[in-house]
């Protein structure tokens, strides 16, 4: 039986019957093969004839998972905070709101920084996507989407375009111009199409490709110019809520988190799920790579944030307190990686010492749940978005 099936359809000769037909890209014992639908059905029937039922395959999968956890446990001999015991504690943490961006008519759901360290794009439940000047708080561009709940937005690396999407199941790209009165909607390009809502999007190293995640349980890589699907990523068993690309110097991988409580690491070239972590007790709302690319953090509805070391292949730290009972909606690292900023559903932002596992500050100001937190490209400030309809710049 095949161990993973991809729904992406291509056209060409079937590897089994050699006829030119629509093909399903599947993996058999980790080897990619292209079979037509008839040959896939025949292969499934042959598997059933051998006694390979869904139940037996599930049991085999659970057995392999248990063995994997046993091997991981053998290497779990020390916690991160124990290693960092002798490190000097951080000094007094002072950060406050420097700017408040007002203009959305409903909950702010997502935001992203431009690489120029000055401009911000944000999206909201009101269906609007706004480009801001973070220095002056002025709005530079505004687009009204054809749907409400625009849950994803991203700035292109060049700063010349923004991408966004939500309940329309699409990822749309809008080129930006110097003319602030130009109608951006007329230049909209629909790049990606999922079968459920778009939860997150991110450009790769250039403006030419974009990565998306969706409520249909998949992630996908698209060509922006043609709108062609380049690679699909299947491995989550529920909605995918967040994704993050590895720092460019560490290779072509990304991490995703979802409602199945899993955080998966993917190889963008092969489409393979190369690592998987399942230690949260509820939905994973946010994932973010450590600046070096050797680890990543996650924030979950179980009221914890966690750190996973990719080289050790295990969880190495949990950031939580008994007094925190609301879920973490968004996480991001400081430029050095020493601090972890986490937005919570109790309206607060907690700042954690990544190495020692202690909380160094609580930032108050928002009047509803914090939905997104992003550190600026130069690390001098960070922006938070909230269901109170505002964004705040902290420094």
UniProtKB/Swiss-Prot annotation:
<dbReference type="GO" id="GO:0005834">
    <property type="term" value="C:heterotrimeric G-protein complex"/>
</dbReference>
<keyword id="KW-0472">Membrane</keyword>
<dbReference type="InterPro" id="IPR015943">
    <property type="entry name" value="WD40/YVTN_repeat-like_dom_sf"/>
</dbReference>
<dbReference type="GO" id="GO:0030159">
    <property type="term" value="F:signaling receptor complex adaptor activity"/>
</dbReference>
<comment type="function">
    <text>Enhances GTPase-activating protein (GAP) activity of regulator of G protein signaling (RGS) proteins, such as RGS7 and RGS9, hence involved in the termination of the signaling initiated by the G protein coupled receptors (GPCRs) by accelerating the GTP hydrolysis on the G-alpha subunits, thereby promoting their inactivation. Increases RGS7 GTPase-activating protein (GAP) activity, thereby regulating mood and cognition. Increases RGS9 GTPase-activating protein (GAP) activity, hence contributes to the deactivation of G protein signaling initiated by D(2) dopamine receptors.</text>
</comment>
<keyword id="KW-0807">Transducer</keyword>
<protein>
    <recommendedName>
        <fullName>Guanine nucleotide-binding protein subunit beta-5b</fullName>
    </recommendedName>
</protein>
<keyword id="KW-0853">WD repeat</keyword>
<feature type="repeat" description="WD 5">
    <location>
        <begin position="279"/>
        <end position="318"/>
    </location>
</feature>
<feature type="repeat" description="WD 7">
    <location>
        <begin position="365"/>
        <end position="395"/>
    </location>
</feature>
<dbReference type="Pfam" id="PF25391">
    <property type="entry name" value="WD40_Gbeta"/>
</dbReference>
<feature type="repeat" description="WD 4">
    <location>
        <begin position="235"/>
        <end position="276"/>
    </location>
</feature>
<dbReference type="InterPro" id="IPR020472">
    <property type="entry name" value="G-protein_beta_WD-40_rep"/>
</dbReference>
<comment type="subunit">
    <text>May interact with RGS9; this interaction stabilizes both proteins and increases RGS9 GTPase-activating protein (GAP) activity, hence accelerating the deactivation of D(2) dopamine receptor-mediated signaling.</text>
</comment>
<dbReference type="InterPro" id="IPR001632">
    <property type="entry name" value="Gprotein_B"/>
</dbReference>
<dbReference type="InterPro" id="IPR019775">
    <property type="entry name" value="WD40_repeat_CS"/>
</dbReference>
<dbReference type="InterPro" id="IPR001680">
    <property type="entry name" value="WD40_rpt"/>
</dbReference>
<feature type="repeat" description="WD 6">
    <location>
        <begin position="320"/>
        <end position="362"/>
    </location>
</feature>
<feature type="repeat" description="WD 3">
    <location>
        <begin position="193"/>
        <end position="234"/>
    </location>
</feature>
<feature type="repeat" description="WD 1">
    <location>
        <begin position="103"/>
        <end position="142"/>
    </location>
</feature>
<dbReference type="GO" id="GO:0005737">
    <property type="term" value="C:cytoplasm"/>
</dbReference>
<comment type="similarity">
    <text>Belongs to the WD repeat G protein beta family.</text>
</comment>
<dbReference type="GO" id="GO:0007212">
    <property type="term" value="P:G protein-coupled dopamine receptor signaling pathway"/>
</dbReference>
<feature type="repeat" description="WD 2">
    <location>
        <begin position="145"/>
        <end position="184"/>
    </location>
</feature>
<dbReference type="InterPro" id="IPR016346">
    <property type="entry name" value="Guanine_nucleotide-bd_bsu"/>
</dbReference>
<dbReference type="InterPro" id="IPR036322">
    <property type="entry name" value="WD40_repeat_dom_sf"/>
</dbReference>
<keyword id="KW-0677">Repeat</keyword>
